[in-house]
Amino acid sequence: VGDVRDSRVVWEDSDSGKFFVSYLFDHPDASNKHYYMNKMRHPGNTHKFHAGGDPFKFKKTRTNKKSDGAGAVFMLRDGTVDHPQLDISQWKTNRFCCTYSNRPKDKDIYGEDMLMMCVYYGCEMYPEINVDLIWEYFEKRGYFAYLTFGTDRKTGKIQKTPGGFSRGEAIEEIFRMWHSYIEWHCEREMHREILQQCKEIDDDMGDYDLFVAGGHALVGANKLAFNPIADKVKEWEKESYYDLHEI
């Protein structure tokens, strides 16, 4: 609130805003959900939302365009809203509810935008880590527990770094998640900007930052059941990189 760090995040309508939002909480107390464990702040709505992020790169893309920093929040299916007998075409959840595509002058502005997005929805972030901007910024700000860690496919162990890449097998997983989502749910999707990138995407994803961010949100949501953050929290606290601030 009022540009005060670590306070409540409140949305305001603006013609020059950086976010497209299709879902806001009806009651303010439902937003900014969090709790503390081992003196570390954790998001409190991880069963309802998950975010993905694709930081901007300094090099130009194939079309000679500077990439944007992108972010997306996916609203998971809520069984209390969309009961099992309800036809999928009538669901109100299981769709994207927030997107962001912008290239601020300062990379920390992008990092703070992604953090505030996650704080408002009370969700974790599965970031693109070819560029470790989001990961480092969340850690620096004391929001390490707002990051999602995947599992190593070969060992089955939790990965040492949060998020995922956009190359090799990781690209295939992003495309698989998008293919499934579009096949079953695209008719209900409210964010045309993200569907447009899905329509235009090719093998080179450099010009499609929102596609990557949304893909990471889908992948991250799928990994939540395999995300024992407690071990990572203990490791992080042991090294004592930063002070934590409670509100």
Predicted segments with their positions:
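RNase H-like, metal-dependent nuclease domains and their acidic two-metal-ion catalytic environment used
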Residues: 1-149, 181-247
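Short alpha-helix plus adjacent loop in nuclease-associated cores
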Residues: 147-185
